[in-house]
């Protein structure tokens, strides 16, 4: 028997442990370790582990309450593409900040640069770097690829978007 050591990547950042509110809940089949898994500091490694939130038919729209006003200059959302499992990277990710949780200001829109037909399992961090600003709330919108692309076995059927961690620095 050839046993391999277990590895897991943890990250500490300003949103670890913060509450997450979704406009559309993740799929019941892909809830990771619960609704706040997006801010638990645990990074996903593959499509078959419990660290990914899965969405299809709806964009991933998540707002995070940092608890207090914090100075931030970087936000990142980790996403997965696994072609054979109908999981595709979002077409773009929008990052917004707010002091009151009601009025949000866009700080960046990051476009996907990975081809939709990439067969290899790909983990991509959509990262926004911007001038330091004070914020208590962070909102992220990952725009889901609406359907599996032409030539894919699931062509025209709903595609999945998977995300593992929303990092705030």
PLM feature spans:
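Short, compositionally stereotyped local motifs that mark structural "simplifiers"
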Residues: 1-47
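Residues that form or immediately flank small-molecule/cofactor binding pockets and catalytic motifs
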Residues: 25, 100, 112
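Solvent-exposed serine/threonine-rich low-complexity stretches and specific carbohydrate-binding patches
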Residues: 106-116
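Aromatic, loop-rich ligand-recognition surfaces of beta-strand-rich domains
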Residues: 44-108, 122-169
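Amphipathic alpha-helical interaction segments
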Residues: 18, 30-32, 38-39, 60, ...
């Amino acid at each position: 028997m050839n046993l391999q050591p277990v590895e897991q990547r943890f990250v500490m950042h300003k949103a670890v442990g913060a509450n997450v509110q979704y406009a559309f809940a993740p799929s019941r089949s892909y809830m990771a370790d619960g609704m706040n898994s997006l801010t638990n500091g645990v990074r996903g490694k593959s499509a078959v582990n419990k660290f990914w939130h899965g969405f299809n038919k709806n964009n991933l729209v998540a707002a995070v309450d940092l608890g207090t006003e914090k100075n931030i200059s970087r936000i990142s959302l980790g996403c997965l593409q696994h072609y054979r499992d109908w999981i595709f990277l979002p077409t773009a990710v929008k990052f917004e900040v707010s002091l009151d949780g009601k009025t949000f200001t866009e700080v960046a829109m990051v476009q996907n640069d990975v081809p939709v037909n990439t067969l290899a399992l790909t983990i991509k961090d959509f990262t926004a770097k911007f001038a330091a600003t004070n914020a208590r709330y962070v909102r992220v919108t990952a725009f889901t690829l609406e359907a599996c692309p032409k030539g894919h076995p699931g062509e025209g059927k709903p595609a999945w978007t998977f995300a593992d961690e929303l990092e705030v620095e």
